[in-house]
């Protein structure tokens, strides 16, 4: 059977494969379009398998939030190069995969691979995409968070697709939840930029805090040596690094020290109640450096750096007429924990021709 240019064009458009590959597949299939598609898929899958030993450390972080802000999904799909990450077909693949994960309630990569998308087993669909796009692609990780009637979730992905965040909040009422969606998205934007590791100091491991506190003091003392040499003001050396180190006894000790300071300054006791709260707030600010670095609630808000996220949430709760509490936080940064493979180009060429 004669293979026409129109047949090649049609097969190419339906599969995304190269022109010569389409022409050859049609020849092998004697012009049968369906058989030609199968032949290309078989060859494509073979090519995809060969690509699977190449590290995929570029790619995209994708976020999908349902219209009512009750469910949000974040995924990381890796490619080998940032060039492919900018490919509209790859971007569509990331978006479709994330939406499929959410709509199907998929929890694991194993579940994803055995699921069905557009009538095709996802694993087969994804390998076909690998063959068409021409690089190894990997669905590395994903997570979905959800909320009940009194909750709200939202998400944000930075414009370069390298960082994405989901945040979920429990609210005092459904009315507050409905009004809080945009605020939660703003918190996601903050977290994308400021990289908190956990929601609160309560989520930090105490042994980790103690080790970090020792390192922090050493860091500040070292810097103070240089500042002293230059005749510049020295850093304050904190007594603590996190609120998880400050219990009732520590707070009582700090309060007593403030009272003694006020007494030494000759401040009348009748005005201490007006002064002490501000000094306690300063005490916390000076002694929670680790919280400010690592916890969402302890960080100063990027849109108002005079207030912590915790303070901003309290203000928003009053504004909306009910309590808002952050209960879920997920942040993906592209390639976290992956080492980017550095290829020996000469060895790769030798392997291809040998």
Swiss-Prot record:
The protein, known as: Elongation factor Ts
Phylogenetic lineage: Bacteria, Pseudomonadati, Campylobacterota, Epsilonproteobacteria, Campylobacterales
Compartment(s): Cytoplasm
GO function terms (MF aspect): translation elongation factor activity
Alphabetized UniProt keyword annotations: Cytoplasm, Elongation factor, Protein biosynthesis
InterPro entries cross-referenced by the UniProt entry: EF-Ts_dimer_sf, Transl_elong_EFTs/EF1B, Transl_elong_EFTs/EF1B_dimer, Transl_elong_Ts_CS, UBA-like_sf
NCBIfam families, A to Z: tsf
Organism: Campylobacter concisus (strain 13826)
Gene3D superfamilies assigned: 1.10.286.20, DNA helicase RuvA subunit, C-terminal domain, Elongation factor Ts, dimerisation domain
